[in-house]
Amino acid sequence: MAGASLNSPESKESVLDFTFSPEEEAFRQEVVAFLEKEGPQEWHKKKVSFFDMSGQENWIAVHRDMSRKLGARGWLSLHWPREYGGQGLSPFYRLILREELARYHCPGYHSLSVDFVAPAILLKGSEELKKRHLPGIASGEIMWCEGLSEPGHGSDMAAIETYAREDGDSYVVNGQKIWTTYAHFAEWMFLLARTDRQAQPNYRGLTFFLVDMCTPGITVNPIINMAGHHDFNEVFFDDVRIPKENIVDSVNRGWYVAMSVLDSERTSDLGYAIAGTLLNDIVEGAREMDMLDSGDKIRMAELVAECEVARLIHYHVTCMQAQGKDTSYEAAMCKLLGFESIQNVAEFGLKVFRNYGLLSDTSPFAPLYGRISSCYLRSFGHSMEAGTSEIDRDIIAQRGLGLPRLR
């Protein structure tokens, strides 16, 4: 971004300039041209969103195919260091790519792999782990899932009980993870497990492992969400043996590895772009069906403003990331505003289309191919990713406003 930085330090009021550079605008046009030629045309026609993806026929194959195409162009590693196969570009190139993928209703960008695992390995992994795992992520060939949440603990990641016992040159893992997105087809998992039951505070006893999902002892059971789609899973570990060489950083340092990359995950999915695209589709569909009244127009204007605020905050955070600044509470604002915008827009769609908005994609009378009800139902679960909205508010209160913890 041409002015994606603070103005001169001499200025009393530093102003952020969100004008994209000619090179960035050229990249945007390159992405648009690529999607028009290589993107899944049926998905574009049906306006399939991030939240409808798993409800589509052959969606895993489409997702993987697009991921490989993005990887072949080097677009999954735009901001990685050149020495590890990246292009060394600013985070704004990733933002531009994600914006256009959302507008085109295109899958293929697997943020768990690109924006959580890859940064963790780049920041904390050994050279061997970098050589072994980064090429598969950059090419789009290898998909990852996350082993964080557990039954009974919810958002309290420090209370993880899944236990890894040292045994020779390996650790033997027993326990359970839940709400594990895409575990049913991912090749690898990044797993946070307890290696010290006596550690105080308890978060100091966690270790970050990389786990081959084909390892004996792993069982994956599906969890069908409210929309009837299969994204989530529960994963059981029964004497699963993980080589010590698959530890990121070192034993009992897993909490710090996870915390170092959570900001990247919180800013990866561009909730404002998903919400804005859905809002445009709702307005277009409602106009065709002549279902917009004056009250709807007022609410629509409010939602446009809400999405715009979320977008500008996201740009601000991306500026900070480009400068290497800490973005802990700003990233929480990005995720909170983005995903709550999606919920608000989907709720608006239900109001605009009335009973028709409740219809699923199996009904020929469903507006937008049933996306309204699907997005509404899915948005609540996805708002919990990378921390619930309550955790986001707590982070903003503590780190942004200097207030005590809310809980």
PLM features per residue range, with description:
Residues 2-111, 132-139, 268, 296-301, ...:
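Amphipathic, small/basic residue-rich leader segments at the start of a protein or domain
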Residues 17, 28, 92, 96-100, ...:
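Glycine-rich phosphate/cofactor-binding loops in nucleotide/flavin-utilizing enzymes
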Residues 140-148, 192:
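A short, Trp-centered hydrophobic/proline-enriched beta-strand micro-motif
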Residues 162-165:
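A structural signal for short hydrophobic beta-strand segments in well-ordered beta-sheet cores
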Residues 3, 18-20, 218-312, 382:
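Glycine-rich beta->alpha junctions and the first turn(s) of the following alpha-helix
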Residues 170, 174-221:
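A short core secondary-structure module
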Residues 43-54, 287-294, 308-364:
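C-terminal helix-coil-helix/basic helical segment that borders enzyme active sites and/or dimer interfaces
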Residues 64-141, 182-188, 307, 321-329, ...:
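Internal helix-loop-helix
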